[in-house]
Each structure stands twice: as C-alpha cells, then as structure tokens.
Amino acid sequence: MQTYTLGNPACNFAPGTLDSVQKPARVLIAASMSLVAVFAMTGCAPDRGPFPVPASSDSDTPVVETPTPTPTPTFNKQLFSVDDPASIWVVVDKLRPLNPQNYAAPDLVSLPVINANPSKLRQEASDALVVMFNAYTAETGLKMASQSAYRSYAAQVSIYNSNVGRLGQVGADLASARGGFSEHQTGLALDIAASPANCTLNQCFADTPQGQWLAANSWQYGWILRYPNGYTDITGYQFEPWHYRYIGVLASTEYHLEGATTLEGFFELPPAVDYAG
C-alpha cells in the first residue's frame, strides 16, 4: 500500500482507506481531508524553519554628519601700524620715539568741549571725545573738561625741561616725556579733568566721579587709560589716571576683552622702563 506523505508525519494516510468506510463516515472524512489540505499549507507543510532576516548593510544606517565648528575670528593686530606716527595705533614710549621726532600731527581741530587750556586733537579723536563727554554728562549730570591735548615738539621740550628743574631728571622722566617721545605730540592723547576742577593732574583724580567713570567706560568710545597704576615697570611712567589715549573703538574693545593694561602688552612690545640712550 502506498502512503501519501505530507510534511508532518501526523498527517499521512494510505490510499483506499476511504473506500472501506461507510458513506456517512466518508462525508466526515472528506471534510477532514479539506482540513488536511489546510494543514498541508500550514502546520503540515514541510518544515522550512524561520524566514531569513536580511542582514543590514552600512548603507542602510543614516549618516550623521558632525558640523565643522566655525573658527573664532582672530583680532588682527597688524591692521594698522604701531610705528607710523600718523596711525591711530602708533605706540610711543621711551624706546619708541616718533619718527621724525619733530612730527606734527595732521588734521588737528579745536576741541568743542570745556577746555581748561586751548586744546586740539586729530579730527577722529575729537569726535570720539565729544561723544564720550556727552555720554558721561547724560548719565551722571556731571561734566568733564580737557586739561591738555596736542603738544608740539617744542612745547614738549619746554615742559620736560621745566620738570627737570623742579623734580630732577629722574623725577622728570617718571612724570613727563622728552620731546619726540610724547603721545601728546600725536594728537591722540588727552589729559582729562573734572569740571569744576577736582584733583586736576593728581592721582586722586582716580577717586573722583569722572575718574571712576572713565576707568570703567572709556573703552566703549575708543579711549584707554594709558598709564595705569602699578605698571611703571612697563610704561616707564607713574600712575596718571587723567591721561587717556585714543586708539579707536575696534582696538579699545579688543583691549577691554583681553583685559589688557598697557599698549606694550597688547601689541607684544618690550617694556619701556627707561630711554635707550
């Protein structure tokens, strides 16, 4: 006898089996055979195991790109010359005289502010000073004045010689510059006073409302305190809380952000404690 074999042994049967069964039973068996066919497609189908799962490929994995960080802009300290006497970044100290030493600043204008003495500055510095003085008055109701601004070579020689007579050469070298070595000769430096006068050209000016405001805010207008307290071993001069230097808002902002204290340090120049000769 031939046996019909399905994938599952439990579903196998032999031919002729139905002929020996009574009709009613055959009907039941026929119905059962229909179920067998279903089983053949399901439970009685040949064992094939689970369907294989396709292996994932690297190309199916989303690629996450790491953004390239934007480099922090570097302040260009070579944008303007520190040697050219006409540059607003010129650095003048005991090792860096003006060239020529009798240099006369261009585009000088009379300062349209309160003046203790007739004062002039270069146009750009003058404009910035007016804005700064007006901002101070608007904020505090108080006033500032120009004590001394541009000085010619001859005027600086006269002032220095006068100080030598009063203070001796060592004292004069701490208190004033020799002719050809003064920032005042650039038309970019200013001695500032309170108005009415209070601690004029004295270190106590640092404690006045004007002196305190300037120390905190002058950088916003392009000005810096040139000879700060405790830096004589770099600048060569005693503390002068009244002496401010214009370098422009671009440089003064960077100067402030870096926490710089002297132009020598800011521009990585050597200390200028004394004259070379």
Positions of predicted regions on the chain:
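Extracytoplasmic cell-surface/polysaccharide-interacting catalytic and binding patches
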Residues: 2-5, 13, 26, 41-149, ...
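Bacterial N-terminal signal peptides that target proteins for export
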Residues: 10-11, 15-31
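Bacterial N-terminal signal peptides
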Residues: 31-40
